[in-house]
Regions:
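A conserved helix-loop-strand patch within extracytoplasmic ligand-binding domains
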Residues: 43-92
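Pocket-flanking alpha-helical
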Residues: 6-37, 59, 141-145
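Ligand-binding "clamshell"
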Residues: 31-43, 58, 130, 135, ...
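Alpha-to-beta junction loops
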Residues: 14-24, 68, 112-115, 129-136
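Extracytoplasmic/secreted proteins, especially bacterial periplasmic and envelope-associated proteins
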Residues: 8, 12, 17, 27, ...
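Solvent-exposed coil/turn segments that connect beta secondary-structure elements
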Residues: 25-27, 48, 56-59, 75, ...
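Conserved small/polar residues in nucleotide/adenosyl-binding loops
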Residues: 164-170
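Short helix-initiation/N-cap motifs at beta->coil->alpha
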Residues: 2-11, 99-126
């Protein structure tokens, strides 16, 4: 079964309708459990799906100019990952301690005065022709026809916290 959002896959596992799902990283799982009062647990990492910065109207990060726009996912943990990747590449600086809960409100320095365009994760790739750059989750990058190794201008390293996980409800263990 394919879902087009991040909520329903966890709801069907929590309800017992499905035994497991496979799409998320630990920060999202933890946030989901806290916000929804669910009892899902990580059953182990499967593979690495890095976030990447991909070309929009610009083909290189060397072309970054004052006022450029960058589209990012707007859900809490994925927006934070996108912002951390932008910070790792010298585009913005976040407040100390912002971490995996960072939002645009945590941007402390913006030397290029970039406009951060916040969109639902599944919409980000669709604005590539309208924004200077896009920052995509690995799954949406693949779905949009991007290759991390061939198309990403920058991407998360394998020691990032962003591994995809299989989850199970606690009552099935």
């Amino acid at each position: 079964t394919v879902f087009d959002d991040y909520v329903r896959p966890n709801e069907v596992v929590e309800s017992g309708e499905f035994d497991a799902n496979y799409f998320q990283h630990i920060p999202y799982l933890d946030q989901f459990n806290e916000e929804k009062g669910t009892h899902l647990v990580n059953a182990g990492g499967i593979h690495y799906e890095p976030f990447g910065i991909y070309p929009g109207t610009k083909d290189s990060l060397d072309d970054l100019e004052d006022g450029d726009s960058i589209a990012v996912p707007n859900d809490t943990t994925n927006e934070a990952r996108a912002l951390l990747l932008l910070q790792d590449n010298g585009i913005i600086k976040l407040k100390d301690g912002a971490g995996l809960e960072a939002t645009v409100n945590d941007i402390e320095e913006n030397p290029y005065n970039v406009e951060i365009v916040e969109l639902a994760a599944e919409q980000v790739a669709r604005v590539a022709e309208e924004t200077s750059y896009i920052v995509l989750n690995g799954n949406y990058a693949l779905q949009a026809g991007y290759s991390v190794s061939k198309d990403a201008l920058a991407y998360e390293t394998s020691d990032s916290v962003s591994y995809t996980h299989l989850t199970l409800p606690t009552n099935s263990l």
